[in-house]
From Swiss-Prot:
<dbReference type="InterPro" id="IPR029063">
    <property type="entry name" value="SAM-dependent_MTases_sf"/>
</dbReference>
<dbReference type="Pfam" id="PF02390">
    <property type="entry name" value="Methyltransf_4"/>
</dbReference>
<dbReference type="GO" id="GO:0043527">
    <property type="term" value="C:tRNA methyltransferase complex"/>
</dbReference>
<comment type="similarity">
    <text>Belongs to the class I-like SAM-binding methyltransferase superfamily. TrmB family.</text>
</comment>
<feature type="binding site">
    <location>
        <position position="125"/>
    </location>
    <ligand>
        <name>S-adenosyl-L-methionine</name>
    </ligand>
</feature>
<comment type="function">
    <text>Catalyzes the formation of N(7)-methylguanine at position 46 (m7G46) in tRNA.</text>
</comment>
<dbReference type="InterPro" id="IPR055361">
    <property type="entry name" value="tRNA_methyltr_TrmB_bact"/>
</dbReference>
<feature type="binding site">
    <location>
        <begin position="199"/>
        <end position="202"/>
    </location>
    <ligand>
        <name>substrate</name>
    </ligand>
</feature>
<feature type="binding site">
    <location>
        <position position="103"/>
    </location>
    <ligand>
        <name>S-adenosyl-L-methionine</name>
    </ligand>
</feature>
<feature type="binding site">
    <location>
        <position position="161"/>
    </location>
    <ligand>
        <name>substrate</name>
    </ligand>
</feature>
<feature type="active site">
    <location>
        <position position="125"/>
    </location>
</feature>
<feature type="binding site">
    <location>
        <position position="76"/>
    </location>
    <ligand>
        <name>S-adenosyl-L-methionine</name>
    </ligand>
</feature>
<keyword id="KW-0808">Transferase</keyword>
<dbReference type="GO" id="GO:0008176">
    <property type="term" value="F:tRNA (guanine(46)-N7)-methyltransferase activity"/>
</dbReference>
<keyword id="KW-0819">tRNA processing</keyword>
<comment type="pathway">
    <text>tRNA modification; N(7)-methylguanine-tRNA biosynthesis.</text>
</comment>
<feature type="binding site">
    <location>
        <position position="129"/>
    </location>
    <ligand>
        <name>substrate</name>
    </ligand>
</feature>
Amino acid sequence: MRSFGRTGGRPLSPRQKTLMAEKLDTYRIAEGDGPLDLCAMFPGKEAFWLEIGFGGAEHMIAQAAQNPDVGIIGCEPFLEGIAKALGGIEETDLNNVRVWPDDARPLIARMPDQCLDRAFVLFPDPWPKRRQHKRRLVQADFLSILHPKMKPGARLRFATDVKSYADEALLTFVSDGRFEWLAASPDDWRCPPQDHVTTRYESKRLGDCKPVWFDFRIR
């Protein structure tokens, strides 16, 4: 079951259409069923990170610019987000970002075991109605797909501004037993982490609570 709705939104601008036509193939991960070779995808990079649902790509582009030795894979099914990522990659002259314009789960399945040093799931679609909760990304089956791909000791960050999703996701992570919650005090989830990059979506405060950030270490 998809954890996102329609993949179209507002029409792309002429510049965005040009980026999609001319640059997408350069930065897109090729479709297929075969395993991914991250070392070949990111020659010389020392670590590999994954961002699932990067939205307007502000966080991903900033992290890539601040961490040039890291190869970052971003997954985003919405075309406008992909176009914004391509624009950010070109404007910042990055060589350490690749994008996947579809559901993250099939791509994660193609990754080698214990290859990821870090993962971000920031403000995913909250599916706020109770009958929609089954569509939320953070479920036990999703963790079973993601966990084997992360190195022992790797970090995962989840953020949301929807209280029911915060409660549900935290319970899902902690109940799994393979994700160690790193909070030592309430400020650790109430305050943005030091390396967090605020996005335009986050600034809109569309949820029903203040943003929370949960950081986990992989066991």
